[in-house]
Amino acid sequence: MDLEIKKDITSNWFKMLQEAIWHTITNLERKDADIKTTVWNRSKKRDEGGGEFRILENGRIFDKVGVNFSKVHGKFPKQFLKNILGAKKAPSFWASGISVVMHMKNPMIPAMHFNTRYICTTQDWFGGGMDVTPSIKDDKEKKEFHKTLKKMCDQHNKKYYTKYKKWCDEYFYLPHRKEPRGIGGIFFDYKKDNFEKDFKFVRDVGITFQFIFEKIIRKKMKKKWTKKHKELQFIKRGRYTEFNLLYDRGTKFGLQTGGNVEGILMSLPPLAKWK
């Protein structure tokens, strides 16, 4: 398949998924919340693409949720060439993707994160994943979450779940705290064996995330909570913030390559505490 066609169909999918996820979010919220939509460009001087991020805050369900779509192209700074697949031969790149971060009002509902992307240098590949970060322990929910992920992964390859779960556990870990960020999920990168099969898997990851977050929210949105629960949520958000600013590759890469700062930092919670 021609590379330009691959770029078109992947970016179209990510944009369509943004619309679908946003539709579900606003249907769940069903009240006046603060909504901000920002269309951004990577460069003010040149055509290097851009994207659109949407943020909903101060809602009935969501304290803050961000859904970002991007389609950008340009050249990597020299310091990145050694670390990015295919960039040594030529610094040019093209990338498109979607990222979602949800911070909930009810501390009984976990924070949730998802992203998928397609990147082209002299090589092309998919990456992404999803993970859940509860403030209040719920073993049953954890079991159901991983069962759903395993079922989805097994439809593509029986080895995917174990491999991508391990990758997620290793990635979403705070070394200075010696603790995981949450209950894990799946994480994958440099997926480039077969475009058609890999793209189908990436689409299923997005569809599964939409199913999972809506199911969890609808199940828990009316659960009662206390100030103690909220304090635990604020502390957990502090850990979330530490990870995103200290270790998250996407955050560091975006800030170091001139990405949209507000879009990059949309993952941060609206309020957090440290003890």
Predicted regions and their residues:
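A generic structural motif
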Residues: 6, 104-106, 122, 132-139, ...
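A long amphipathic alpha-helix within ATP-dependent nucleotide-binding catalytic cores
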Residues: 92-94, 148, 152, 156, ...
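Long, contiguous binding/interaction regions
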Residues: 104, 251-275
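Internal mixed beta-strand/loop scaffold within catalytic domains of large alpha/beta enzymes
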Residues: 51-128
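Glycine-rich, often proline-containing surface loops adjacent to acidic residues and nearby aromatics
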Residues: 94-96, 125-133, 179-193, 240-242
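Compact, glycine/acidic-enriched structural inserts
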Residues: 122-166
